Amino acid sequence: KRQQQYLDSLKTTWLEYQKRYQLTLDDFAAVCFHLPYPKLALKGLKKIMDKNLPQEKKDLLQKHFDQSILYSQKVGNIYTGSLFLGLLSLLENTDSLKAGDKIALYSYGSGAVAEFFSGELVEGYEAYLDKDRLNKLNQRTALSVADYEKVFFEEVDLDETNSAQFAGYENQDFALVEIVDHQRRYSKVEK
């Protein structure tokens, strides 16, 4: 039932978007979706795919879709952020987008709240991307459930000011370095 709500909301918002802005899929270089899981978003892409689009355009939209789901396949569902993780995945894993290209975006939330909107790539956007992120994701170390639970349930000893210092995270890019008044503070690890 939830899958059908997702797809019905996509169809409704896409039709309304087309009506308001007089745009079709041919106007977009890519479509990014809220990704509870990639197969549902793929069904969505197929649901809105215009049968009259040239095969070359259909292939490009499919290629960009495949690039947009790479991070979600590694990370899993991050709920609200999944659309933007998909956008980041697309931008960092393609070489066929350029400034001026339009990207359609479909946001969906529980309760059948949905929105269809678009963005346009600006000059210089590539400077903000990490083209090696997929490689970094592939280099992660799997934790056993026991090791994960050990870290997750670890008690933090707070001092009398509700603060704590941390060490031992020197091999990571970012680390929890302290807690001050119940606020976690993270920092980029200088290597």
Put a short name on every predicted segment.
Residues 1-191:
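Terminal domain-initiation and capping elements
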